Amino acid sequence: MQRERTAESSLRVISKEKNSITVEMINYDNTLLRTLVEEILKDDQVDEARYYIKHPVIDNPQIYVRVKSGKPQSAIKRAVRKLSKLYEDLGTQFQKEFQRYESDHMIKAVE
C-alpha cells in the first residue's frame, strides 16, 4: 500500500473486529499520533493502543486499538474529544495572554 501524496488528511479503516480496530492515518504526522495514543491509553476500557508505520517513505501510519469492553472506535472518539477540548482551551489561553500583552504594551507606548 503506497502512501498517498495529497495534502488533505483522511482516515481509512483497515480492519475491524468486535474489540479492536486498525485505522490508516493518511497525511498525519507522528507527533499527533503519539499524543492520540497516549490519550487513548488513559481510558480504563482500553487494553492496548499503538501506532506504527510499516515503511516510513511509502506507507501511512496506522493506529491500532483493542478494548476490554465497549467499541474500539468509541475509545478513539473519546480521546479525540478530550484532545480537542485541551487544544481549544490552550488556544483560548494564548489568545487572552496575547491580548493582555498587547494591551499592556500599548498603554506603556502611549505614556
Curated annotation (Swiss-Prot):
Keyword terms, alphabetized: Cytoplasm, DNA-directed RNA polymerase, Nucleotidyltransferase, Transcription, Transferase
The keyword Transmembrane belongs to this UniProt entry's keyword annotation: no
InterPro entries, sorted: RBP11-like (IPR036603), RBP11-like_dimer (IPR009025), RNA_pol_Rpb11_13-16kDa_CS (IPR008193), Rpo11-like (IPR022905)
Q: Where in the cell is it found?
A: Cytoplasm
Gene Ontology terms, MF aspect: DNA binding; DNA-directed RNA polymerase activity; protein dimerization activity
Q: Which PROSITE patterns match?
A: RNA_POL_L_13KD (PS01154)
The cross-references to Gene3D superfamilies, in alphabetical order and at most eight, read:
RNA polymerase, RBP11-like subunit
| One Gene Ontology CC term in the entry | DNA-directed RNA polymerase complex
Q: Which reaction does it catalyse?
A: RNA(n) + a ribonucleoside 5'-triphosphate = RNA(n+1) + diphosphate
Share an example GO biological-process annotation for this protein.
DNA-templated transcription
Per the UniProt entry, the Enzyme Commission number(s) are: 2.7.7.6
Q: Which domain of life is it from?
A: Archaea
Write out the function statement from the record.
DNA-dependent RNA polymerase (RNAP) catalyzes the transcription of DNA into RNA using the four ribonucleoside triphosphates as substrates.
Q: Oligomeric state and partners? A: Part of the RNA polymerase complex.
HAMAP family xrefs: RNApol_arch_Rpo11
Q: Which protein family is named in the record?
A: Belongs to the archaeal Rpo11/eukaryotic RPB11/RPC19 RNA polymerase subunit family.
Protein name as catalogued: DNA-directed RNA polymerase subunit Rpo11
Q: Which organism is it from?
A: Thermoplasma acidophilum (strain ATCC 25905 / DSM 1728 / JCM 9062 / NBRC 15155 / AMRC-C165)
What gene, per UniProt, encodes this protein? rpo11
